[in-house]
Amino acid sequence: DNLKDQVTAGKDNNHDSHKSNGSNGMARLSANRPFDSVSVQIVFHDEFNMLERLAPSQRLPYLALCTQLLNQAVTELLKQPLLLGVSAINEPHFDESGAYVMLKADNSHATVALAGVMLAKLYLMLNKIIHDKHIELSRFALPAKAGVSDNAQVEAMSHLLESVGKKEQMLILLPNAGIKQINHHVQLQSVMRPTTVYERECAIFDGGNDAMIQRLADVRNAVLMIEETEEQG
């Protein structure tokens, strides 16, 4: 089941709540659109289509490693008291087009947008370590980029990651309520010279406050310890 199927399923689940807004994309992009879940998309930054050229004997273990890392990242991150009431709806799985995690708020106090941004940043941190380690050992690895959006904007975010996303970058496309959840924790910047309404609405993660980055570093280390223990086992 590839990423597009998962994304389509996510969108279908969400269509009903947006029918009242009319079918045009602009209404769906309304800054006050309601949301109680976010989608985190992780895609490989693979300019030369190297992944599909790899022999399955190399590609499949690499995708399995990425899947394992992402699932451990979700499990460890959601133990954080700050993210109480946020849960993962699916078990993410990497294929050539990346992976997709849907997080939902189980109550009105749960900071699901913050959880999405923290998960995206955490995976990018982990991926960079694995990437650098693999390259050092002359093994295959790719940099990644990530997008965090509400479910109404999953497709738009896929396009944004392709058109404006740079390697190791995180793009964010959320309604006001979501931006409000993350404002105190992260710095955001705008897309330079936007050419579409989505590019204009999109924000680029430009760093987190010390407390958040420290928290993420702790979770990253916990995930890497699990990884090392399993490798030795």
Describe the residue ranges of each PLM region.
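Intrinsically disordered, glycine/charged-rich C-terminal tails and inter-domain linkers
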Residues: 1-35, 160-233
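Structural motif
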Residues: 43-46, 145-152, 174-177
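Short, surface-exposed beta-strand/loop "edge" segments at domain boundaries and coil↔beta transitions
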Residues: 48-54, 109-111, 154-158, 179-183
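Acidic, low-complexity cytosolic segments
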Residues: 113-117, 121
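Catalytic core of nucleotidyl cyclases, primarily class III adenylyl/guanylyl cyclases
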Residues: 82-112, 129-161
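Short C-terminal domain-edge/linker segments immediately following a structured domain
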Residues: 70-77, 131-135, 177-180, 203-205
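Catalytic NTP-binding/metal-coordinating core of nucleotidyl cyclase/transferase enzymes
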Residues: 4-110
